């Protein structure tokens, strides 16, 4: 509907609900990851029209139980923030009163009437969400599998952005303020690539008519969805002592195959047979047959070329 702004229709009659996903995608940068994660928190909490968590939730409930959620994700050297709304189709509403327009209006309020004051988020709500995110990250760090995965990525990747988890790190979140996060949000609205996914049953003309009411201007976006790390014939190792009932082994392997390459599907099948599923070689041999690991699996990120193998093992072994 404008340069750098795309609408995707995904028709389906499987569900009683329709889903709208508004995605903002920018370049992956260590300096903005925490800001963007805080933006995702604020989008799901309140806005100027509904300035408290309670009034925000009550409005969603009044829209026949419409659900709103946000998430962040990375793909290659990009970082995305999603705001998702799931609501009942008109056929399942007694009044059949055009719920689509109300839901779209609520989305517009979340995006263009954020809970702000003088070019920054309202401090009271922002401080709560900031603390919630820090607590979430601290709890994750206490999980040995998550902690070892983060440390493995720090050791493997040379790109600073890829070393950082998609929600940031506690120290990065702590450094942000209601002003810096709000300014990042304004930049996202005007500079990020925008993808709007309409999943369900929609009137295409009605959707485009509604979205043209959003002040979405064209933007030039240059994004790198695939990352190919320079090959280095050096094995990096790190051992970190930690109090735990079991030890975690993380292994990272580099593959040059990228999404869409001729070997892409073969590599996906290989990973499934190697370690991703319960019938894979790693699980059936090392865990079930040999008993060398409490748990073991593999995962492959086609957008960075990293094959990760992780296992919970007895520290004596």
What annotation goes with each model-predicted range?
Residues 105-117, 213-221:
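A common structural junction motif
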Residues 46-49, 91-94, 113-122:
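Short, polar/flexible loop-turn hinges at active-site or ligand-entry regions and domain interfaces
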Residues 1-63, 169-172, 182-285:
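His/Glu-rich zincin catalytic helix
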